[in-house]
Design a protein with these regions (language model features):
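Electropositive, glycine- and tryptophan-enriched low-complexity nucleic-acid-binding patches
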Residues: 100-150
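Flexible loop/turn segments at secondary-structure boundaries
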Residues: 24-25, 85-87, 120, 130-131, ...
Length: 339
């Protein structure tokens, strides 16, 4: 099943096309692959804990690959994000929630974290269509940090506004990780922006920038917030007179806000956060090439196990890239590639 996912056949009924492929059967040392019903019975028979066991297996494989490929990263950047898988059947766990491309349809919202330097998937899982809670986000970040190889000494974390919560900050701090998280709109934060002392931003694409200390409701202490302000065009102002839908609602400006424990200048914090766009590309690769969005069953546990099989196939490609680099090439210099 993993080899089928790896070479571009994400659905179990597609394996019949390569049932007698000489390369694949030669690798597996069989005359032909079993029929589709055999694969389906096998996947349905896997118990609920297999998904987490596969994450543990991938952790062990990662450590061995890094050792064999001479990857010695002491500093890593972890990018956490969610994606939306629209469902067209009656799969268990489907919810009508955030789904910008197919509004009103049920979906799953998996949560995934990648290592930016090597593009590896390190932790994640299939989730129902509801937005993740603060506890789920905090537990996920702790699991990510625990899954990193022992050679890693310093962690940097990046996440979008979907992870803007007290539990995420506390989880990063427990792991002694530095972080940058995009802020989410609240009335108090908007008021802080209006009161902030703005200055021209010469090293970013924004017109103005500012920073301030701020303690959101329910947080244990204040943190550093940095913000960029963009002036709206006349068309944007006119189009939003009837519908205000943006991060920070104001008649004249658009804002980008980040909470961070980095001490570097504002332009560096913004540049560092912008690099997490690679995580979205990695999710697209996993969805389109590794079959991540192919859910073979109506049962949530079966789809969760298949999710980890797809990500194992994705990681196999990343690990082969580590072995394929030139002897003196650093792992962080590898070019992005699709399966």
């Amino acid at each position: 099943i993993v080899l089928g996912l790896y070479i571009g056949f994400p659905r179990l009924n597609q394996l019949r096309f390569i049932a007698r492929d000489p390369i694949l059967t030669g690798i597996l040392k069989v005359s032909k692959l079993p029929v589709q019903s055999t694969f389906r019975r096998f996947v349905n028979a896997l118990h609920l804990n297999v998904a987490r066991q596969m994450l543990t297996i991938m952790r062990t494989m990662r450590e061995r690959v890094w050792a064999a490929a001479n990857v010695k990263l002491e500093v890593v950047t972890i990018d956490t994000d969610t994606t939306v898988h629209t469902l067209y059947g009656q799969q268990m766990g489907g919810r009508k929630s955030y789904n910008p491309k197919n509004k009103g349809k049920k979906s799953y919202q998996p949560m995934l974290t990648f290592i930016s330097e090597t593009r590896e998937y390190i932790w994640g899982g299939l989730r129902n269509g509801d937005r993740p809670t603060g506890k789920q986000i905090g537990d996920h970040i702790r699991d990510v940090c625990a899954a990193l190889p022992p050679c890693v000494k310093q962690i940097y974390g990046r996440a979008d506004s979907g992870f803007y919560c007290r539990e995420a900050i506390e989880a990063y701090e427990e792991c002694t990780a530095r972080f940058v998280i995009s802020g989410r709109k609240t009335s108090r934060l908007v008021e802080q922006l209006r009161q902030a002392e703005w200055k021209p931003s010469k090293k970013t694409d924004a017109g103005w920038e500012c920073e301030f200390r701020y303690q959101p409701d329910g947080w244990k202490k204040d943190y550093r917030f940095v913000a960029l302000r963009y002036e709206k065009t006349r068309e944007e102002v006119e189009s939003e007179e009837t519908e205000q839908y943006q991060l920070f609602e104001t008649s004249q400006y658009k804002y980008r806000v980040f909470v961070t424990d980095l001490t570097e200048p504002i332009d560096f914090v913004v540049w560092f956060y912008n690099q997490r766009g690679g995580a979205e590309n990695l999710i697209k690769e996993a969805n389109n090439d590794a079959g991540l969005a192919a859910h073979p069953s109506g049962r949530f546990d079966v789809n969760g196990n298949h999710f980890q099989l797809a990500m194992l196939a994705y990681n196999l490609n990343c690990w082969l890239m580590l072995f394929n680099r030139a002897p003196q090439t650093d792992a962080t210099a590898l070019q992005h590639t699709t399966l």
